[in-house]
Regions:
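Class I SAM-dependent methyltransferase SAM/SAH-binding core
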Residues: 55-99
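A short acidic, Gly/Pro-enriched loop at the edge of an enzyme's catalytic core
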Residues: 98-110
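A short SAM/SAH-binding and catalytic strip from SAM-dependent methyltransferases
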Residues: 109-123
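A short glycine-rich, Lys/Arg-flanked "PGG" loop and its adjoining helix->strand segment in the class I
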Residues: 125-137
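Short alpha-helix
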Residues: 184-203
Length: 227
């Protein structure tokens, strides 16, 4: 999946994906970001993993000292630079989320939302352990995935993307709740709350699992410095 997103849905195409969102999907996206902003408000340094064109960073930045976004696609960072041009407290870096070039305990909060745990196509344990490593003791770590309750709206969103020519047609026979398969090779899964809890437990952290808006599932962690 990480390879797919290095070749598809980059820059302006990624922005078009969000332009196609239905009212229910827009509600989901807004509720997810609002929860993030509430949790990181007042933090000095916040990192977003997989920042794309800057959609979440733009909402976070006014409420934090400095917002950092990393992405594996240079095209996304170019779009983000333009999208965030009015903000003076954002730093954008080309970086792999499982090999972060940051010192330990560098950030007050680390954020990975909208199913990045699956969409990045990387080792999930390494993704979580890197997020833990770069977050300071008592700092906040937020990961989110899709709630099963948003499945029907989620798959319809992908159908809309396919109709717009952004992705291949949805393979209806192979797509099941939690997993979307398209005919161009896209295969996108999701993680359950229990999976997120277990991933953080392996890194010595206790995750609070919480559903937001009946659309996203958050793992909310206050970083334990003993791990």
């Amino acid at each position: 999946m990480g390879t797919y997103y290095r070749r598809h849905l980059l820059g302006s195409d990624l922005q078009r994906v969000y332009d196609l969102a239905s009212p229910r999907i827009r509600q989901y996206l807004n509720a997810e970001v609002e929860n993030v902003v509430e949790r990181v408000r007042g933090a000095d340094r916040v990192l977003e993993l997989g920042c794309g064109y800057g959609r979440v960073l733009r909402e976070m930045a006014p409420h934090v000292g400095r917002a950092f976004g990393i992405d594996i696609a240079a095209a996304n960072l170019r779009s983000a630079s333009s999208y965030l041009s009015s903000l003076k407290n954002c730093d954008l870096l080309l970086m792999n989320a499982v090999r972060l070039a940051f010192a330990d305990a560098r950030f007050d909060a680390t954020v990975c939302v909208q199913n990045g745990i699956s969409a990045f196509g990387v080792d999930r344990s390494k993704l979580v352990s890197e997020a833990v490593r770069v977050t300071r003791n008592r700092g906040q770590i937020l990961f989110s995935t899709y709630s099963p309750r948003i499945w029907a709206d989620r798959v319809e969103w992908f159908r809309a993307q396919a109709r717009a020519g952004l992705i291949g047609p949805v393979d209806e026979s192979r797509s099941r709740e939690g997993t979307i398969v398209c005919q161009d090779g896209l295969r996108l899964t999701s993680a359950s709350g229990e999976e997120l809890r277990d991933l953080f437990a392996r890194s010595g952290q206790v995750a609070r699992i919480r559903e937001v808006d009946q659309s996203s599932v958050f793992a909310e962690v206050t970083r334990d410095g003993l791990s």
